[in-house]
Amino acid sequence: MQVDLQSSAQSAHALHLFHQHSPLVHCMTNDVVQTFTANTLLALGASPAMVIETEEASQFAAIASALLINVGTLTQLRAQSMCAAVEQAKSSQTPWTLDPVAVGALDYRRRFCLELLPHKPTAIRGNASEIMALAGIANGGRGVDTTDAAANAIPAAQTLARETGAIVVVTGEMDYVTDGHRIIGIHGGDPLMTKVVGTGCALSAVVAACCALPGDTLENVASACHWMKQAGERAVARSEGPGSFVPHFLDALWQLTQEVQA
């Protein structure tokens, strides 16, 4: 199994495209991470919108550059809104990304996510336990936390990618991105990133935005992982702990965009 490493040059090119296109991202994400997700997208040059009402969600999915479905705080009413948005995204050819938070641990959200898969997500982003559960290989995870190493989920990610046509991202100490055939690995980041709520969810929003960019979607999605890990490393170097990490992380994302424009 060959894993190609993401190049800094490709990531810089994708970030330049990102800034040029400034994707409008419809984030149907969980209540815990909305502000952090929006600020992450803004720092990179995208435009976030958090539209959740069923009638509006369907309408907005048609005009957005990309749609994110994150089931972290799923309710039946929210599920209805998400279904309406996904159906409209499919009709409007709006790329959409699924973040199957904690599907390995909870039955309702696992059933809901499995019902969404026939609508052909452009990308799926999760930790190892989530991806393995969604692929039907194993159920597990401790809530939103993984109990499996990212590398162990590569076969499940490849299977899921081939079955759905999605780019599948498995995040961990090393991230892996696959279309079912090619596999790209992304080094970096820091364990402190796991002590801040929302870093994975925010990555899913950036992945969604990258699905709206022209060019190689696999490379663009891998670039999203690279930016987040780069920014995480820079932020940790300036931080004293989780509390000071967040502002330094947002600053680091902003600085990355400034560097590619210089």
Curated annotation (Swiss-Prot):
| One example GO MF annotation | ATP binding
Q: Report the record's Gene Ontology biological process terms.
A: thiamine biosynthetic process; thiamine diphosphate biosynthetic process
- InterPro entries per record: Hyethyz_kinase, Ribokinase-like
Q: Which UniProt keywords apply?
A: ATP-binding, Kinase, Magnesium, Metal-binding, Nucleotide-binding, Thiamine biosynthesis, Transferase
CDD domains this protein is in? Answer: THZ_kinase (cd01170)
Q: Which Pfam families match?
A: HK
Instruction: Give the enzyme class.
Output: transferase
**NCBIfam families recorded for this chain?**
PRK09355.1 (NF006830), thiM (TIGR00694)
> What is the name of this protein?
Hydroxyethylthiazole kinase
Which organism is this protein's natural source? Shigella boydii serotype 4 (strain Sb227)
What gene name is listed for this protein?
thiM
